[in-house]
Design a protein with these regions (language model features):
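Conserved strand-to-loop turn within each blade of WD40 beta-propeller repeats
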Residues: 117-119, 161-162, 204-205, 243-245, ...
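Eukaryotic protein-protein interaction scaffolds centered on beta-propeller repeats
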Residues: 19-103, 267-275, 283, 358-364, ...
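A short beta-strand motif characteristic of beta-propeller blades
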Residues: 90-95, 132-138, 176-182, 217-223, ...
Length: 434
């Protein structure tokens, strides 16, 4: 795994300073690492070692900022080889029906279904309750689907076509009728829905921001000379945020006024400053999201970092560094305490925003760049997609992975295995007791 060496070094660095029951912490880390390096042709043993490490982690007085990361990775890798489809070379949490890069994944109003888009020109609808079922093709084009967005009510899906226009696709299908699709042929840089309204906002290739409605006249609400990568509209006050290729974050506040760019670079005052010796500079802004509380704007940049911006105070909160390449997508979970990021470094990461000392959970199983990620509506799962054409589902809570191991295996560690991988001085117990 690409991130395993870096992760291990981080773990060892933090562990060297751990003062809280180092014996248990060391045992959990050692067993997790041994499970990770155990070959896949010993799936039961690999899984039982990971599950027992989880039991020690859950029950013991373990150093909290290290072990959760190791435990999650070991549990995930162990689960990967339980029920592995060697014919199709696919793990239990992996599906693939796109023939090219997966560019977006989004959920609608029904938490059991999600949608994906690809450079192959298709938009597919997937059933989470039946992951091996064939997805429904709800839209198909000979153009590249740059991204998709869902309206707040979950009734309309927007497919943004690269260097082209967009398609508005009804998700409410009558079984006796074809899926309704409304085409907007005007070429756009990007687009988004207006929260709470039956309107959407586009950025024309010439830079005009145009507000459009299903039954209303189009209205220009802004203009920019910069290349816009993504739009985000604040649900609370209607402010439009635009992340640009030039690294400028523009904003249009209500009442909207058509002005020449730049409208407002809200990061201008600190762009040349340092943050813990870290030069901020100007790097392309690729993705934006606003926290459920409406107080924080998360900004993903080409540098591989995430800027957290205090919206009411208009000031920097902190910068999160960890990705080795461009951040491609970003999303808060429904509670606003976790942040999901994806990157061209081939990983997705889940960051705990309540404690900056906690290492992120690193989701490292894609073979290419990871372009998109999304929490499910309950925040219990993450869906990711990328350049390897596959979509993967990840539980946020490692307890699900631990439970699946015992559901898939009908044995426990033998005494000999316990002595080898746990320790002769530690009393034997059943890893899967139920």
């Amino acid at each position: 795994m690409r991130s395993l060496l870096t992760t291990t070094l981080l773990i060892l660095s933090i562990y060297s300073n751990a003062q809280k029951n180092p014996t248990t912490t060391e045992l959990v880390m050692s067993m997790s690492q041994r499970s990770l390096v155990m070959p896949g042709y010993l799936p039961d043993l690999k899984a039982l070692i990971a599950r027992q490490a989880y039991e020690f982690w859950k029950e013991g007085n373990v150093e909290p900022y290290v072990s959760h990361l190791n435990v999650y990775q070991a549990l995930y890798e162990a689960n990967k080889y339980l029920g592995y489809d060697s014919v199709r070379n696919m793990a239990y949490n992996q599906v693939g029906m796109h023939s090219n890069t997966v560019t977006s994944v989004v959920f609608g109003s029904d938490p059991n279904f999600y949608y994906s888009s690809s450079t192959d020109g298709k938009v597919l609808k997937w059933d989470l309750t039946s992951p091996r079922s064939i997805p429904e093709t709800i839209y198909e084009s000979d153009k590249i689907v740059q991204s998709i967005e869902m309206s707040n009510d979950g009734k309309v899906l927007m497919a943004i076509l690269y260097q082209e226009g967009l398609a508005l696709i009804s998700t409410e299908k009558n079984p006796h009728e074809d899926i309704k699709v409304l085409e907007d042929p005007q070429p756009v840089q990007t687009a988004t829905f207006i929260p709470g309204e039956r309107k959407y906002l586009t950025v024309a290739k010439s830079g005009e921001l145009i507000l459009k409605g299903f039954n209303t006249k189009s209205e220009q609400v802004g203009k920019t000379a910069l290349k816009i990568n993504q739009l985000k509209v604040d649900e609370q006050d209607g402010t439009i945020y635009a992340g640009t290729e030039e690294g400028v974050l523009e904003a249009w506040e209500k009442p909207y006024q058509v002005k020449e760019s730049p409208i407002e670079d809200i990061m201008e005052n600190w762009r040349q400053q340092s943050y813990f010796g870290y030069k901020l500079g100007s790097f392309s802004i690729n993705c934006l999201d606003i926290s459920p509380s409406g107080d924080i704007l998360a900004i993903g940049r080409d540098r591989g970092d995430i800027v957290l911006w205090d919206i009411p105070k208009k000031q920097l909160i902190r910068i999160i560094s960890g990705h080795q390449s461009t951040v491609t997508d970003i999303q808060f979970n429904p509670k606003g305490d976790l942040l999901l990021t994806t990157s061209r470094d081939g990983t997705a990461r889940i960051w705990d925003l309540t404690d900056s000392r906690k290492l992120p959970i690193i989701l490292d199983d894609h073979d290419e760049w990871v372009f998109t990620g999304s929490f499910n509506p309950s925040g219990t799962q993450v869906i990711t997609g990328g350049g390897d054409e596959y979509i993967r589902t990840w539980p946020v809570d490692p307890s699900y992975l631990a439970f699946r191991i015992c559901a898939m295996i009908n044995r426990n560690l033998t005494q000999e295995e316990w002595d080898e991988f746990v320790g002769r001085d530690i009393p034997y117990s059943m890893t899967c007791s139920d």
